[in-house]
Amino acid sequence: MSKKYAAFITALFCVFIFGFGAALLISPDRDFSQQENRYLAKFEAPTLSTLKSGEFMKDFEQYVIDQFPLRDGWIQLKAWCERLVGKQENNGVYLGTDDGQTLFAQYTKPSAEDLAKRVGYVNQLGANVEVPVYFALIPDKSYVWADRLPHRAPLVDDGSTIQESMDLTGEDVTYIDLRDAFSGDDVFYRTDHHWSLFGAFQGYEALNQAMGVETVTPEGEPTRVSDSFYGTTYSSSGAGWVRPDEIYTWVSPQGITVTAYPAGQPEPGVLYDKSYLEKKDKYSMFLGGNKPLAVLENPQATGGKLLVIRDSYSDALAPFLAQSWQEVHLFDVRYNLNSVQQYVEENHIDQVLVLFSASNFSTESNLFVMSR
């Protein structure tokens, strides 16, 4: 290697390092990444305590990673490079065999002890209340669309979490097996972990059949409201080549009253908040996003009062449930730590449904609320 060439490489390296360092200092910090759909780390001034504990360096490292100039472009470049060398995974996301158009988040199965504790909370709920309690886990996309997974992908849902949950369910709770409820190419979003409108409808049919409630097929045809949805799995994958998903609605909001409780007090809610269609988080169009509690009322329905202990999958399911139940109470344990037993009694609930995705049930830290 000639001295001139070595000097050129050294100079180029210095320009790269100092240039990006200067850009990091000059550029204003970003609060939120639309690409990754998450808040980014901010700079925290060091203190004697954080310097001694090493916490400052840990936080500063995350700050540099999050605020690195042109971060979104580098993430996509890395994904392209990984794909070109034949890798089937990037940033914890598997690339589907359909030319990488379906993205699968890695699924980590809980330990036997942890799963027993989690199902135990459901069993305690069944023992605490005097009304029927149903329990169902929604299989992960990697279970339903296993034929699209890359060969020998290790961290996927093989159905064993659901089977073991069924085996652990006590006599006071009726388990509803949804593993065979889904069919078709559109029951999940390719770029997100949630089920689509069509998957939610198939889940609704299976749940109602098990609970002995009439299934109502909405009038007309589903309406496409967005053709540019990129979900959370896409956000972490960097897979810039993937086509966007489409979002549909089907149930008319007419005749359905929604009351939301974002901070403990009732406020008028909506079945569909279409302002979210102009944002990255388009899935939050259903019910307007996460709420500790929401109540849907439909006096024309034939069912009674249903309480759903739920995660975000029920946002897309709720419009269908509102066709069958006069009242649907959506209780989100992520944000609502009140006594479920007391809620059932005070609101004269007729049936309780505990419904989570298998992945969320395996990781949610507030399931203990059900035992109160």
Identify the function of each model-found stretch.
Residues 1-372:
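Extracellular glycan-modifying ectodomains
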